[in-house]
């Protein structure tokens, strides 16, 4: 209760905390951060009521994973200050311990880098600061006895660094449609906010029943409420633990942890593919692995224990946050530690990189907070992934004295979802909280659409790429649903993009997408039509741009023309005819000459990049073949174009 981890042998009686320890010992603790590099005072008042006089009892702090920092006494007049595995305690020192049935006061004073241990206000010894093994703080009996505790206090000057826009709304439990009596963990909200994935532990509804450690479940938004959570099925879940780490922005790729490695499953027409392992070269030494896939698919932020940890110690399970970046050749980089501005001697876990690619949420017990793991946020400052703003605590409406983690936000930033043991229906439950503008990630655009065969309007499975036309760099990738052709991708404002889909035996019609600067989330519809590579097909080069009134290519035309070069190289038997068209502003002769010159410029580009001139014919039509009336600038823009016709395959 109140965040304490305790067993059935612990209870409150007559305003005292009672531990009826067995021969195996018993303990009760709360997870609470102590900055051991700063001054603090830890005090405990306890009394042995019964049991052997030689049994040790006392307090512990900064402990975890079977390693403790302990100040213990026995009723026969002994004390121990110990750091490590309690099973290794061998040496006891004499002290004036009050006999059984009387209160003893233990006090640790940490001042100016020296730790002083007092018993009943008498100094026993001083030491240098002991190591940090975790955040557990509590009291313990190592043998059979009845132990009562009347006080435990920690005094330390700690500042909880709060966001100036900390959430003030109340959190809401998602209720019994989502949460069961078991642990419900690891929520992942889809980018569009319409699907919620979660992990359910030891549920009768798991593929392996109640003995199944973890299955993936999901729920869909039905307009005014979430549907009843369902098991994702046997194509994904097994009788063993199935650990879903991330979902791609297009909702068509799932990232799993399998045998301590990352693997992906792709959506198929009938469900999900078999897992394919990603070539990430590291070996996580921790029992836990949590990750987040960036919206552009080019970064995986994860929590792991590696030799590169800020406070690496093979004796304890302490995770840091790392990132692996997808390189131009499709391979993944070695892990990059996110740095000491984020990682601490404590544990950092459950990272979630928001759709803006810059705002990172994570849980930590290594910095001042409200209790156990608290949720924090930080913002990436550059592309090194090691420069971040100082993390801020998300505040008491989200964080409690208990475990709070697994924060996840859709692209809209309207709601956040997270896990807490506080105020739950069962054990760990999933909550939501409405966000206001000041505590949302940066606003983005969600582009949604379908990939279709232009000839028959049928959906296609394809890879979709978005590129910044100014920098010529890919800025996002997605996959379309093989059954429906649907895709979605997140893009920042203030950039002009080229959008294309790739599929064998098809030529993508490349679309131009202009996203002016803005600070409000919005959704844009954009279907992508793919043209089958067949004789007689006419294909428009959408992203080929010329200087006004000239046959001079603008720099942002290169990506489109480079892809045509690639298609011609991959299909060496194809011949094409380039066709140039203008708007109707000018004399026919001048417009005809301009269209012919522009065709010649495009042909020269292709030849310069390795395509035989004999494979390329060309013809200019001036303004004689418009596709619109040309009565507005928007219509004239559509008439100004370069196309090519496949003349031989």
Whereabouts are the PLM-identified features?
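Secretory/extracellular carbohydrate-interaction modules
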Residues: 22-85
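Short tryptophan-centered beta-strand motifs in secreted/extracellular beta-sheet-rich domains
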Residues: 42-44, 102-111, 115-117
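Flexible glycan-contacting loops in extracellular carbohydrate-active proteins
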Residues: 127-150
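Short, conserved micro-motifs composed of acidic
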Residues: 157-450, 454-455, 470, 477-479, ...
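Periplasmic OmpA-like peptidoglycan-binding domain that tethers envelope proteins to the cell wall
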Residues: 364, 369-371, 571, 579-649
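Short amphipathic beta-strand segments in non-cytosolic proteins
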Residues: 463-483
């Amino acid at each position: 209760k109140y965040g304490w981890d305790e067993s059935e042998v612990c209870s409150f009686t007559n305003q005292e905390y009672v531990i009826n320890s067995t021969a195996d010992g018993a303990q009760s603790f709360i997870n609470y951060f102590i900055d051991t590099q700063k001054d603090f005072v830890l005090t405990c008042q306890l009394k042995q009521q019964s049991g052997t006089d030689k049994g040790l009892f006392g307090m512990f702090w900064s402990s975890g994973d079977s390693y403790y920092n302990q100040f213990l006494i026995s009723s026969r007049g002994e004390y121990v200050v110990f750091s490590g595995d309690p099973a290794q305690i061998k040496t006891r020192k004499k002290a004036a311990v009050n006999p059984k049935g009387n209160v003893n006061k233990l006090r640790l004073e940490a001042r100016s880098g020296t730790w002083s241990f007092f018993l009943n206000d008498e100094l026993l010894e001083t030491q240098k600061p002991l190591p940090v093994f975790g955040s557990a703080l509590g009291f313990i009996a190592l043998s059979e006895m009845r132990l009562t505790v009347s006080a435990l206090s920690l005094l330390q000057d700690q500042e909880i660094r709060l966001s100036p826009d900390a959430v003030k709304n109340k959190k809401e439990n998602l209720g019994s449609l989502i949460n069961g009596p078991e642990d419900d963990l690891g929520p992942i909200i889809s980018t569009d906010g319409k699907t919620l994935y979660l992990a359910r532990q030891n549920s009768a509804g798991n593929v392996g029943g109640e003995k199944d450690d973890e299955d993936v479940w999901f729920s869909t938004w039905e307009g005014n409420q979430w549907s009843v959570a369902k098991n994702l099925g046997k194509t994904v879940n097994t009788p063993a633990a199935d650990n879903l780490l991330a979902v791609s922005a297009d909702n068509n790729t799932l990232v799993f942890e399998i045998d301590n490695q990352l693997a992906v499953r792709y959506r198929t027409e009938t469900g999900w593919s078999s897992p394919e392992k990603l070539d990430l070269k590291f070996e996580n030494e921790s029992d836990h692995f949590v990750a987040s896939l960036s919206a552009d698919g080019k970064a995986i932020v994860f929590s792991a224990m590696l030799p590169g940890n800020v406070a690496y110690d093979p004796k304890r399970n302490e995770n840091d946050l790392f990132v692996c970046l997808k390189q131009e050749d499709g391979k993944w980089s070695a892990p990059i530690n996110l740095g000491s501005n984020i990682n601490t001697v404590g544990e950092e876990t459950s990272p979630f990189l928001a759709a803006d690619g810059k705002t990172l949420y994570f849980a930590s017990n290594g910095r001042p907070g409200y209790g156990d793991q608290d949720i924090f946020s930080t913002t990436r400052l550059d592309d090194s992934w090691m420069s971040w703003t100082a993390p801020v605590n998300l505040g008491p409406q989200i964080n409690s004295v208990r475990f709070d983690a697994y924060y996840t936000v859709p692209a809209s930033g309207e709601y956040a979802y997270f896990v807490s043991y506080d105020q739950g229906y069962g054990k760990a439950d999933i909550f939501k909280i409405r966000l206001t503008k000041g505590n949302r990630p940066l606003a983005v655009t969600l582009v949604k659409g379908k990939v279709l065969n232009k000839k028959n309007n049928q959906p296609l499975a394809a890879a979709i790429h978005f590129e910044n036309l100014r920098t010529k760099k890919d800025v996002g990738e997605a996959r379309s649903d093989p059954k429906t052709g649907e895709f979605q991708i997140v893009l920042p404002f203030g950039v002009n993009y080229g959008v294309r889909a790739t599929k064998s035996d098809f030529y993508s019609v490349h679309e131009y997408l202009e996203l002016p600067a803005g600070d409000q989330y919005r959704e844009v519809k954009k279907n992508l039509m793919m043209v089958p590579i067949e004789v007689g097909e006419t294909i428009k080069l959408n992203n080929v741009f010329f200087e006004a009134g000239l046959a001079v290519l603008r720099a942002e035309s290169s990506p489109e023309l480079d892809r045509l070069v690639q298609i011609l190289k991959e299909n060496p038997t194809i011949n094409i005819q380039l066709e140039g068209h203008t708007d109707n502003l000018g004399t026919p002769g001048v417009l005809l000459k301009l269209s012919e010159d522009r065709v010649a410029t495009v042909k020269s580009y292709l030849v310069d990049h390795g395509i035989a001139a004999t494979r390329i014919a060309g013809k200019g039509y001036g303004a004689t073949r418009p596709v619109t009336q040309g009565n507005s600038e928007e219509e004239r823009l559509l008439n100004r174009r370069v196309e090519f016709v496949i003349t031989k395959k």
